[in-house]
């Protein structure tokens, strides 16, 4: 069993973006390829949770397993994706990553996993005053909490955090760059992110 594993959530339908965000172009590749390059440099095992509509296209781009949600919970948002990844890879801790934060750095995963300890169920960053539960780490004991929520048809990350002993870390306290956490939801944000990248 790995001590740490990674789960990339690439199953959303990207309605506001207009096309699958995982496949958006970024620095000569795609969001999903860039994110996986970063994650696999730090983590031994990584799995991508994808949607049936794009699963084959994602599989052609990446060198890690690509799976869909557990059938019974398909379409139940990030909680379904996280628990599906936890079932696929056995690990003590899981670093979670959405497919729409292409600025993420391998340094972030080093910082994040360095903050884990057995007394906590989760480690969640607070960036510019906002909790980032999808750029966080979760202990494998959280799996049962997720199943319990899904059985009650509860799908909120906030509901999950309310049931966990969470270590919140302020980004500035751990030298985390706020740019790592910028997520792209619309084409306007995508254009801005590309401009910001070219200005660096």
From Swiss-Prot:
GTP binds at residues 9-11, 21, 69, 100. GO terms for cellular component: cytoplasm. Pfam families: NTP_transf_3. It catalyses: Mo-molybdopterin + GTP + H(+) = Mo-molybdopterin guanine dinucleotide + diphosphate. Its EC number is 2.7.7.77. Disulfide bonds: none annotated. Its cofactor is Mg(2+). It is found in: Cytoplasm. The N-terminal domain determines nucleotide recognition and specific binding, while the C-terminal domain determines the specific binding to the target protein. This is Probable molybdenum cofactor guanylyltransferase. The gene is mobA.
